[in-house]
């Protein structure tokens, strides 16, 4: 046990030595893609890929917390994913129950706070209960915020937010002059979080699939070739090193 702890500490130190500690992205968002293809390559059912993907979430959460990432948003289930086979959807809906049952004690120990964005009221009762229990048990934690985007879609979020803004303006007798970027930001599901500096998508696909479409306007995109179950701590560090090698301009010019 002691040897294992020493090895873990050495690994974390090695990762920290590879990175510029002054330029760790505060908020990393990940599109966890490739579970189904991972299983298909191994002639396994798709649900096996989702199970292995859950193990990857644990690894990435640990390392993100250890290196000082403040926010980690994971695209767990989109508003479009309901069209998948019922058996697969049912399995995915049960994953948070199993995941949080086994991982919650460690999340509490590591001071990780569990949060969600998305239309979670539409989820099965058991899923909602597991999520709410994790939120309650970690509510006072002050470390990494682990944010699951579940039953989430960027367009659906914008429609929902626009309706709320319209109702607010109407009820308070305000006109549209009040609307600016800050006003919109304050009505999004992500209002309590900074925009992601880094967006990672695994599996090699190069699209954002309706994920945080407002929030990633100035994010750095990295499309990693690994399927999500194969994505590990080393791959995350590689992505962060690529991010650190770039110069973020926000539409301006770089300094010569």
From Swiss-Prot:
Give the note describing cofactor binding and stoichiometry.
Answer: Binds 2 magnesium ions per subunit.
A Pfam family this protein belongs to? Prenyltransf
Superkingdom in the source lineage: Bacteria
Q: Which residues form the active site?
A: 33, 81 (proton acceptor)
Q: Where, in this chain's numbering, is substrate bound?
A: 34-38, 46, 50, 78-80, 82, 84, 201, 207-209
Q: Name one GO cellular component term.
A: cytosol
* Sites where the protein binds Mg(2+): 33, 220
Q: Which EC number(s) does UniProt give?
A: 2.5.1.-
Gene Ontology BP term (one):
polyprenol biosynthetic process
Q: Name one GO molecular function term.
A: manganese ion binding
Q: Which cofactor does it need?
A: Mg(2+)
| SUPFAM superfamilies with a match to the protein in the record | Undecaprenyl diphosphate synthase
**Record keywords:** Magnesium, Metal-binding, Transferase
According to the UniProt record, what class of enzyme is this? Answer: transferase
Q: Which family does it belong to?
A: Belongs to the UPP synthase family.
Q: How does it assemble?
A: Homodimer.
Question: In UniProt terms, what function does this protein have?
Answer: Catalyzes the condensation of isopentenyl diphosphate (IPP) with allylic pyrophosphates generating different type of terpenoids.
HAMAP family in the record: ISPT
The name this protein goes by in its record: Isoprenyl transferase
Q: Specify the species.
A: Staphylococcus aureus (strain N315)
Report the gene name. uppS
């Amino acid at each position: 046990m002691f040897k294992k702890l020493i090895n873990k500490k050495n690994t974390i130190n090695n990762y920290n030595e590879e990175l510029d500690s002054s330029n760790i992205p505060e908020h990393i968002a990940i599109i966890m893609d490739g579970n189904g293809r991972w299983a298909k390559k191994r002639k396994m059912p798709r649900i096996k890929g989702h199970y292995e993907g859950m193990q990857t979430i644990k690894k990435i959460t640990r390392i993100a917390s250890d290196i000082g990432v403040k926010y980690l948003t994971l695209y767990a289930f989109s508003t479009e994913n309901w069209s998948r086979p019922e058996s697969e959807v049912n399995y995915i809906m049960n994953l948070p129950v199993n995941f949080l049952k086994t991982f919650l004690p460690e999340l509490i120990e590591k001071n990780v706070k569990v949060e969600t964005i998305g239309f979670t009221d539409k989820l099965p009762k058991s899923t909602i209960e597991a999520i709410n229990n994790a939120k309650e048990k970690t509510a006072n934690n002050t470390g990494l915020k682990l944010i699951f985007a579940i039953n989430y879609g960027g367009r659906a979020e914008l429609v929902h937010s626009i309706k709320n803004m319209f109702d607010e303006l109407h009820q308070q007798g305000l006109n549209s002059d009040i609307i600016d970027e800050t006003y919109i930001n304050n009505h999004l599901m992500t209002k309590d979080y900074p925009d992601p500096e880094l967006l990672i998508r695994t599996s090699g696909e190069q699209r954002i699939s309706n994920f945080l479409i407002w929030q990633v306007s100035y994010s750095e995109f990295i499309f990693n070739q690994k399927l999500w179950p194969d994505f590990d701590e080393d791959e995350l560090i590689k992505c962060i090193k690529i991010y650190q090698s770039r110069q973020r301009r926000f539409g301006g010019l770089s300094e010569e």
